[in-house]
Regions:
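Short beta->alpha linker loops
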Residues: 32-35, 59-60
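Glycine-rich phosphate-binding segment of PLP-dependent enzymes
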Residues: 2-31, 41-56
């Protein structure tokens, strides 16, 4: 089994926060109002752009991704979701469907329809530049952005509800995209 914990392992501050929360309120259903959610909502309103005033609290990452897909499809009326290969978005039905690593293969062809994967800009295993490791970051990045643009055109821009991207791929190698890949 593999896992990725972006906050580290054994951090005493995290452990203490878990203990404190368990002593105050060990469980809350997604729709329940709690002090922790109120504090998080206040913090989000301080750091997010103006106008983003509603938040959907979920139980975890896979649940958040599933809800994001439902919201994107419902809001746009479009169906397709694009996601990178080597990504990991969770193990629930929808989340494993958008996951781009081989863990999803055992569930195919029963995965959620409408998912399209595209290549990620990973220098170590670059599809486009295996024989040219000295290519500039700018050109390397642009080739992968061009690839994504081509996928969008082939799939039909008017059919795409969302593009789901990890800012840094975690469980599949801590893959940091090159500068310029993400805005």
């Amino acid at each position: 089994m593999t896992m990725c914990v972006s906050i580290g392992h054994g951090d005493q501050r995290v452990i203490q926060a878990i203990i404190d929360q368990a002593q105050e309120l060990p469980y809350a259903a997604p729709g329940m109002a709690t002090r922790a959610r109120a504090m998080l909502g206040k913090k989000l309103s301080e750091i997010l752009p103006a106008g983003l005033t509603r938040y959907l609290y979920t139980l975890g990452g896979a649940d958040a991704n599933e809800n994001a897909i439902k919201l994107a499809r419902g809001y746009t009326g479009k169906f397709k979701v694009l996601s990178r290969y080597r990504s990991y978005h969770g193990a629930t039905f929808g989340a494993i469907s958008v996951t781009g690593d081989p863990r999803r293969v055992v569930w195919e062809p029963a995965v959620m329809p409408g998912v399209v994967h595209f290549l990620d800009p990973y220098r170590y295993r670059s599809t486009f530049h295996r024989n040219n490791p000295d290519i500039s970051d700018e050109e390397f990045c642009q080739d992968y952005l061009n690839h994504l643009e081509e996928i969008i055109q082939y799939e039909g821009p008017d059919t795409i509800a969302a593009i789901l991207v990890e800012s840094v791929t975690g469980t599949n190698g801590v893959i940091v995209p090159p500068d310029g890949y993400l805005p």
